[in-house]
A protein has these predicted regions:
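Hydrophobic/aromatic residues positioned on beta-strands within the core alpha/beta folds
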Residues: 126-127
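Short hydrophobic/Thr-rich beta-strand motif most characteristic of the beta2 strand and flanking loop
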Residues: 27, 68-78, 83
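Conserved sequence signature across two-component system core domains
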Residues: 50-51, 74, 94
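Two-component signal transduction core modules
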Residues: 94, 123, 146-147
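As written
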Residues: 137-147
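Conserved phosphotransfer microenvironments
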Residues: 57, 81, 87-118, 130-134
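Short acidic-hydrophobic, aromatic-tinged amphipathic segments that line or gate anion-handling sites
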Residues: 74-75, 146-149
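Non-catalytic signal-transmission and effector/linker regions of two-component phosphorelay proteins
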Residues: 1-65, 85, 89-90, 115-116, ...
C-alpha cells in the first residue's frame, strides 16, 4: 500500500496516499474555490472515456477531477450516437484508450465515428503502442492529439491545450471548400 508517514502527528501515523491532501498545480490562482484551469480545460465539466478501467482511467479521473470536471465511462453508460449527441453540449473533450478496441482497424473506425458524430469536441487518443506523443495534425481525421501511455500530468495538460487548437483547425477544415468542389 502506498502512503506517507505524517511526521506532524504525535506517533508518525501512516496515511494512505488516497487520503493525503497534496498541493496541486491546479491550486494556484484559485478564485472563489475554483481553479483558473477549470474555465480553461473543463468549463462544461464533462469528459467521456472510451476504454477499460485501469491505471490510465484512474489517472484521467484524478486529473480531470482536479480541473473541476468529471469522467463518464462510455461502456458503463451504453454510449450510442443519440446518447453522445445529447451529452455533446456538456462535453469538454473525449478520451479514447486503445483498450476500447480489439484491433487497430476497429480503433480507427471508432475514432472516425466519434469525429463524424461530434466534430467540435476535441478527441485525444491514448495508446501504449505509439512511439511517442503526437501533437501534429497528420491524424486529424481520427483525433486531435495522440498520447503515449503511461503519461504524466504535465503531458496531459499540454495535450489538452494543443487538442483544442488542433480541433479548431479540424472544424475549420470541414467548412473550407474541398479541392474537388473548386474544379467543378
Amino acid at each position: 500500500m502506498f502512503g506517507y508517514v505524517d511526521s506532524r502527528a504525535e506517533n508518525n501515523t501512516f496515511v494512505p496516499a488516497s487520503q493525503v491532501q497534496r498541493p496541486s498545480m491546479f491550486g494556484w490562482g484559485r478564485s472563489r474555490s475554483r481553479s483558473v484551469f477549470i474555465s480553461t480545460f473543463c468549463p462544461r465539466g464533462k469528459t467521456v472515456f472510451f476504454g477499460r478501467r485501469g491505471y490510465v482511467s484512474d489517472c484521467m479521473d484524478e486529473w480531470i477531477g482536479l480541473m473541476g470536471g468529471s469522467v463518464t465511462y462510455a461502456e458503463e453508460a451504453g454510449a450510442g450516437e443519440d446518447w453522445l449527441r445529447r451529452l455533446a453540449p456538456r462535453l469538454d473533450f473525449i478520451l479514447v484508450d486503445e483498450s476500447a478496441a480489439e484491433d487497430i482497424r476497429q480503433l480507427v473506425e471508432h475514432c472516425l465515428f466519434l469525429r463524424r458524430a461530434l466534430p467540435e469536441v476535441p478527441l485525444l487518443l491514448l495508446s501504449p503502442s505509439v512511439k511517442g506523443d503526437d501533437f501534429g495534425t497528420e491524424r486529424m481525421a481520427i483525433c486531435d492529439v495522440t498520447l503515449r501511455t503511461p503519461l504524466s500530468q504535465a503531458a496531459f495538460v499540454r495535450a489538452l491545450r494543443i487538442a483544442r487548437s488542433n480541433n479548431r483547425r479540424y472544424v475549420g477544415s470541414l467548412a473550407a471548400p474541398q479541392p474537388s468542389a473548386l474544379r467543378a
